[in-house]
């Protein structure tokens, strides 16, 4: 097919109409609960240090002969939204385009739509309940099940992820066709076993919230004060899709800097370019971000379930190969 006649949208117009109604319902859900809708930049002077995220960049050609500078396309509005929290915004939500320079396929498009919201003074389980409320309202689905990472890992892998020996994890991974080296990183093994063994077996009949991921996978979440082995982080799964990723947010600027530095050390080990640390974000934490929980939810995947579609292309206007 030539570019000349490859002009039709990826999704049917009927799905565009249904999508618009669902977006309106999402906005109504949050405005009725008193959250402020915000807009933040999709271009930033800072990328992200996360080892597992590949970021698009562009060059800003500054006027009047000034030196051009690299700008990064947002992988999430998280840092900017937390700066708003620190400035006193109160509870906020955003529906925005985000970009990840990764695969395109049935469940992925490098440009996609994300719903992200933050709740000052909410603990993790209270936010889990609110995500559950939203899913029930939008998808008309049963209430979510809520189980710990440790429990579901033991249930389906047969090992305790918090205490198993690395050799046991290597053996389990090899049974599932992962070519694990003898010195394989523990988190790599846990992530493989969770994604390949656990995820396909959970959330089939109703959504499931998996909480208390290992503290080594805390990202921007607080470590649990009750059990230092786990982080106050959760993810939602339903019908074979990872839908949402949430945290009881880390507000300690010094600890966050340390984690960013560890990210860059890992990047060097993997022969990946390091990323400049977002000093504006850290300054906001230093100034005092309120205790809060936040979550990011993939709108396009939500639409796939709501519209009973197998491919992400069926719920977005133009996929990357047709943009």
UniProtKB/Swiss-Prot annotation:
Task: List residues binding ATP.
Answer: 100-102, 109, 242-243, 298
Q: Name one GO cellular component term.
A: cytoplasm
Q: Which UniProt keywords apply?
A: ATP-binding, Ligase, Nucleotide-binding
Q: Which reaction does it catalyse?
A: D-beta-lysine + L-lysyl-[protein] + ATP = N(6)-((3R)-3,6-diaminohexanoyl)-L-lysyl-[protein] + AMP + diphosphate + H(+)
EC class = ligase
A single Gene Ontology molecular function, please? tRNA binding
Gene3D superfamilies, alphabetically?
Bira Bifunctional Protein, Domain 2 (3.30.930.10)
Q: What is this protein called?
A: Elongation factor P--(R)-beta-lysine ligase
- State which gene encodes it: epmA
